[in-house]
């Protein structure tokens, strides 16, 4: 008996995305066509088991392959904070360094008294818009950030309004640079 390769499991990518190619092509074309391309802003809807999460995963895979940064999240409490954290991760900074005397007898012994301590870098709380704009500065011309937000129907309207507003302003900020659309650092959202 041959096993069915299609196992409808939450988020599991099937071996074939039947009937989805036009949507995938629209998204891919949106990434390629530069700022303002309609395929860059999508809302995937459907009943439970339709494959919405799979489509978002496919968009993320496609964007990554084309050199875009991808932030994939689920619309739940703290959505905007998690996006800011993903875009502007905190690193470590040198908190203090103490270089003390060093003693060495070649071939016999050596000693050094010194220490360094590190702490998480202190970072001002970034707004979502600031975090996106800062990250875009690091992206290659014509590339940008793809946001895939799963379970958007269950999101707090406040989170979705905050995200939509930030994206709208970032797109406008890019327009104010007088850079050709094909070279602008863009945003895509699904």
Regions found by a protein language model. Give the residues of each.
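P-loop NTPase nucleotide-binding core
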Residues: 35-164, 184-187
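Conserved catalytic/switch belt of AAA+ P-loop NTPases
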Residues: 161-182
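A short, basic N-terminal segment
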Residues: 1-42, 86-89, 175-181
